From Swiss-Prot:
It holds the Pfam family Chorismate_synt. GO terms for cellular component: cytosol. The lineage of its organism: Bacteria, Pseudomonadati, Bacteroidota, Bacteroidia, Bacteroidales. It comes from Porphyromonas gingivalis (strain ATCC BAA-308 / W83). HAMAP family: Chorismate_synth. Its EC number is 4.2.3.5. Homotetramer. FMN binds at R123, S124, S125, N240, A241, G285, K300, P301, T302, P303, T304, R326. This is Chorismate synthase. The keyword Thylakoid does not apply. Reduced FMN (FMNH(2)). NADP(+) binds at R46. Pathway: Metabolic intermediate biosynthesis; chorismate biosynthesis; chorismate from D-erythrose 4-phosphate and phosphoenolpyruvate: step 7/7.
Length: 368
C-alpha cells in the first residue's frame, strides 16, 4: 500500500536514490491557502545533515507543486508535488547489490517481489518520509482554525529517558532547543552521550518519541474498525524503524485495577464535564474525549552499522558484512517531525469524517 487515509488521502512515490520522491494529496477541501514557508520549516526539521547526530547526506528538499494549487490556494483537485534527490551516492551500494543487510527490508522485498532497488534501500528508505512531512504541513494548515496543537519530542534514547517526575507539556521551542529534540536539558545531555558512544563504536541506538495533542474536539474517530487510536497507531507504525506504539498509559494499564485505570468524571461549573485523570490518553471507545491525546512510538536502532555482522546473499551463502553508506546513528531526533506529520494527516482525515457524522444534540463540554 502506498496510500494512507480515507477522506484526506496521501499517496507517495519514489526511491531513495531515484530521480525524485513525491506525493499526491487527495480530498483536501478547496480554498485553503497553503503557506510555503510553513512547509519549508517542517522539512528543515526533518532534513539530514543538521547536526553531528544525523546522516551527513545533504538534500535541499525543495518542493515543486505540480497540481492542485492556484494562486496559492487549493482548488479541490489532487495536490501533486515532487522533491528532487540531489545528493545520492549509489556507488556506495554496488558491493551490496546481492547481499541482504540485517535489519533492513532487503530480504523481505526480494522474496515478495523478486526484485529490489539496492541503492540506499530504495522504496523502503526513510527518504520517503520527506513526502509525509510536506503533506502533514498541508494537513496542519487545514486544521489551524480549530486551534489544535501537536508537539512530539524525544523522551528516551537507549536506556536514558526523561524522568517521570519531570514530564510535562513541552513547547515547540523547548523541543527545538535540543540537537536531539529532547526538551529536558539534563536528559538531553545524557542522551547525546549515548548516541556519541554508539557512533564511536560503529553502532547505533534506538529510542522513544512522545506526542501530545491538545484541543481536539470531543467525537473524532469511529467505533470498532475506525477507532482514532487505531488510525494513529497504523500511521505511526508505518514510519521507518517504528516498532512499538501505546496510547495513554498503554501497557502500564495491564498492571492496574479498574479503580485505578478508569478516568472518572465530575460535573464542571460551566455545565460541561471534567476528567479526574487521563489514563486512556484522550480516547475512549475509539473516539476523542476532548482531553489531551497522548501516545508514544518506539523506534529500533538504525540497522546500518559499521560493526561486522553475519548475513547471507541472494545465492544463499553465509557471509560477513560491515555496512557502508551515510546513516543516522539514531533515527529518533529526525523521526520527531515525521511523527507530528503523520499525526496531522490522521487528524485531518478524522476531521473530515467528523463533519459528516457528528451528533447535533451534544451539549456537554469537556474541560480536560
Amino acid at each position: 500500500m502506498n496510500t494512507i487515509g480515507k477522506l484526506f488521502r496521501l499517496t507517495t512515490f519514489g526511491e531513495s536514490h531515484g530521480k525524485a520522491i513525491g506525493g499526491v494529496i487527495d480530498g483536501c477541501p478547496a480554498g485553503l491557502f497553503v503557506d510555503m514557508e510553513t512547509i519549508e520549516r517542517e522539512l528543515l526539521r526533518r532534513r539530514p545533515g543538521q547536526s553531528h547526530y544525523t546522516s551527513p547526506r545533504q538534500e535541499s528538499d525543495m518542493v515543486q507543486f505540480i497540481s492542485g494549487l492556484f494562486r496559492g490556494e487549493t482548488t479541490g483537485a489532487p495536490i501533486a508535488f515532487m522533491i528532487d534527490n540531489k545528493d545520492v551516492r549509489s556507488a556506495d551500494y554496488d558491493s551490496l547489490s546481492s547481499i541482504f543487510r540485517p535489519g533492513h527490508a532487503d530480504y523481505t522485498y526480494f522474496h515478495k517481489y523478486g526484485i529490489r532497488d539496492t541503492r540506499g534501500g530504495g522504496r523502503s528508505s526513510a527518504r520517503e518520509t520527506a513526502v509525509r512531512v510536506v503533506a502533514g504541513a498541508v494537513a496542519k494548515q487545514l486544521l489551524a482554525p480549530l486551534g489544535i496543537r501537536c508537539t512530539a519530542y524525544t523522551s528516551q534514547i537507549g536506556p536514558v529517558c526523561i524522568p517521570q517526575e519531570n514530564a510535562k507539556e513541552y513547547s515547540p521551542e523547548e523541543v527545538e532547543s535540543s540537537p536531539i529534540r529532547c526538551p529536558d536539558p539534563n536528559a538531553s545531555g545524557l542522551m547525546e552521550a549515548v548516541i556519541e558512544t554508539a557512533k564511536k563504536e560503529s553502532d547505533s541506538v534506538g529510542g522513544i518519541v512522545d506526542c501530545q495533542i491538545s484541543d481536539v474536539p470531543v467525537g473524532w474517530g469511529e467505533p470498532l474498525y475506525g477507532k482514532l487510536h487505531a488510525a494513529l497507531g497504523a500511521a505511526m507504525l508505518s514510519i521507518n524503524a517504528a516498532k512499538g506504539f501505546e496510547v495513554g498509559d498503554g501497557f502500564a494499564l495491564a498492571s492496574m485495577r479498574g479503580s485505578e485505570a478508569n478516568d472518572q468524571m465530575v460535573a464542571a461549573e460551566d455545565g460541561g464535564i471534567s476528567f479526574l485523570s487521563n489514563h486512556s490518553g484522550g480516547i475512549s471507545g475509539g473516539i476523542s474525549t476532548g482531553q489531551d491525546i497522548r501516545f508514544r512510538v518506539a523506534f529500533k536502532p538504525t540497522p546500518t552499522i559499521g560493526q561486522k555482522q553475519q548475513t547471507v546473499n541472494e545465492q544463499g551463502e553465509s557471509i560477513s558484512l560491515s555496512a557502508v553508506g551515510r546513516h543516522d546513528p539514531c533515527v529518533v531526533p529526525r523521526a520527531v517531525p515525521v511523527v507530528e506529520a503523520m499525526t496531522w494527516l490522521t487528524l485531518a482525515d478524522a476531521y473530515l469524517a467528523s463533519r459528516s457524522g457528528r451528533c447535533a444534540h451534544s451539549s456537554l463540554k469537556c474541560n480536560g
